[in-house]
A protein has these predicted regions:
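Alpha-helical subdomain
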Residues: 2-189
Length: 189
């Protein structure tokens, strides 16, 4: 599990957290942290049935639509494959809704795909043809299905700059064989 400056008693909010499976898994490993899972109201019953009783004092659910302004102050806001499904216009809106509650030292942690570069600065292929084809097909699926593309690191930086120049990618952790990466973003108030 990627460790993004975990601090005891900090509050972690997962936006679009569904039944809370990620927050529950983290809570089992980090007993001094508190979690709020935010998602649409219709998910709450499913969340409650999924929550182990021994974690109920540290993991809770709050109805929230991430297209609306954030309403809690958390130390870390976490989103897993949330922005992936939205074009830049809507992804900017989702992240912008966090701004009033971000403070110096706040983190935004994304678990998202980071499309690798296919070519170097001289136009030479740096990944095999079969992989370039696979990545292109993923791009086309996202374009047809959600009117967006898989984002490269430069695209993630551009998206964050559209929200606020104080948002800075501090680290990108990719793991062998994994489709998703952890993008650790700090707020320089």
């Amino acid at each position: 599990m990627y460790q993004y400056r975990l601090v005891a008693n900090h509050l972690y909010s997962q936006l679009g957290g569904s039944r809370g499976h990620d927050a529950i898994a983290q809570a089992k490993h980090f007993p001094k942290l508190k979690y709020i899972v935010q998602d649409l109201p219709e998910v709450e019953e499913s969340f409650n049935s999924n929550l182990p009783k021994n974690l109920a004092h540290r993991v809770s659910f709050q109805p929230h639509d991430f297209f609306q302004p954030q309403n809690i102050q958390a130390d870390v806001y976490f989103m897993k494959v949330v922005l992936h499904d939205w074009s830049d216009k809507y992804a900017v809106q989702i992240v912008s809704n966090l701004l009033p509650y971000l403070k110096r030292g706040s983190r935004l942690v994304l678990c998202e795909g980071v499309q690798p570069e296919s070519y170097d600065a001289h136009g030479n292929a740096i990944i095999p043809l079969f992989l370039r084809r696979l990545l292109s097909s993923m791009d086309l699926q996202m374009l047809v299905g959600a009117n967006c593309l898989e984002r490269r690191l430069a695209d993630w930086k551009d998206l964050l700059a559209q929200v606020d120049k104080k948002l800075e990618i501090r680290n990108v952790a990719s793991f062998p064989g994994a489709v998703l990466s952890i993008i650790d973003i700090g707020y320089n108030a």
